Regions:
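Catalytic cores of alpha/beta
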Residues: 95, 100-113, 171-173, 207-209, ...
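Hydrophobic faces of well-ordered beta-strands that scaffold small-molecule active sites
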Residues: 13-17, 56-58, 93-96, 116-118, ...
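Alpha-helix-loop-beta-strand connector modules within alpha/beta enzyme cores
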Residues: 9-10, 15, 67-95, 133-154, ...
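Conserved anion-binding
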Residues: 22, 103, 107-184
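Conserved, mostly hydrophobic/aromatic
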Residues: 15, 48, 56, 116, ...
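Glycine-rich, proline-tolerant flexible connector loops at the mouths of alpha/beta enzymes
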Residues: 49-77, 123-127, 182-195, 244-249
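Active-site mouth loops of central-metabolism enzymes
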Residues: 18-43, 93-100, 154-170, 219-220
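N-terminal amphipathic alpha-helix/helix-capping segment at the start of soluble metabolic enzymes
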Residues: 1-34, 139, 143-144
Length: 274
């Protein structure tokens, strides 16, 4: 599997690097500074790497509410931030321009990301309204951008949205892999930080044994071993932050706590040793 080729290990842990609200986002105020956002990103990156994660996934987590077609300024700011901190990235990294698959691919091209994550296929409805992802256009765009080495991790049950496809998730997973050649499938709960169903992870892995299956939410030291019994990797965001919270009472991004990362990775290392 490509994960072993990229990381030379099994049961990979991908740490989320959540960017602060960016210029043009509702939570960005006139007094905010892009230089400060860059410094915050650098701090979180160092905490994740020093804590021992295997990879980093950079997203515009605080661009609430998310756009189906992202403003150019948001993508441009993400590219600048990643460019500023890239020399400090010593592990494979990915990008997620949330809810905009085309922007995610173009950002990946600009910063030479190893992988990307996104809602690339399917039809969903949620707080942001109705959206239909045209995977045919996205994969053709990927070809145009010469991104044959870029690995794509697909949400098949995105957080906070309802899939209008009434088939069982396992059937959706199988057809997604067959039609798109997905490199990985992300299994989520209903919201960030919520515990993902381990039975669902196992069912998808059994149905798609040659495809990387990732536990995408709710991974903590007391739950990660049971998830990694079936998942090939896990994406961890909320737990790594100070106090295990996504944001403070004012809606601001909370920084990554290196000690929480080390604690978590210690459990994972023991699990890997069997």
């Amino acid at each position: 599997m490509w994960m072993q080729e990229l990381w030379h290990k099994e049961k990979v842990i991908i740490g989320m690097l959540h960017l602060d609200a960016l210029p043009g986002n509702p939570r960005y105020s006139a007094g905010d500074s892009l230089d400060t956002i860059i410094e915050h990103a650098r701090m979180d990156l160092k905490a994740l790497i020093n804590g021992g994660v295997d990879a980093v996934l950079i997203s515009n987590e605080f661009s609430f509410p998310y756009q189906r077609k992202m403003d150019f300024v948001t993508v441009a700011c993400m590219a600048r931030i990643i460019g500023e901190i890239k020399k400090d990235i010593t592990v494979p990294f990915g990008v997620d321009a949330i809810s905009d698959g085309a922007a995610t691919l173009e950002l990946a091209r600009a910063v030479d990301a190893d992988f990307c994550r996104g809602t690339f296929s399917g039809v969903y409805v949620g707080d942001g309204g109705f959206y239909n992802n045209d995977i045919s256009k996205l994969l053709r765009r990927k070809t145009e951008l010469h991104l044959s080495d870029l690995k794509m991790l697909y949400f098949i049950n995105p957080e906070s949205d309802i899939n209008l496809d009434t088939r069982e998730l396992v059937e959706i997973a199988k057809s997604t892999v067959f039609k798109t050649g997905a490199d990985g499938l992300c299994i989520s709960a209903s919201a960030a930080g919520q515990d993902v169903n381990e039975t669902l992870i196992r069912s998808v892995k059994d149905a798609c044994p040659t495809i990387a299956v990732l536990a995408n939410t709710g991974c903590r030291p007391d739950t990660i071993e049971s998830k990694l019994k079936y998942a090939d990797a896990a994406v961890v965001g909320t737990y790594f932050k100070k106090g295990g919270k996504l944001q403070d009472d004012d809606g601001n991004n909370i920084r990554v706590d290196v000690n929480r990362v080390k604690e978590f990775m210690g459990v994972v290392d023991q699990f890997r040793k069997g």
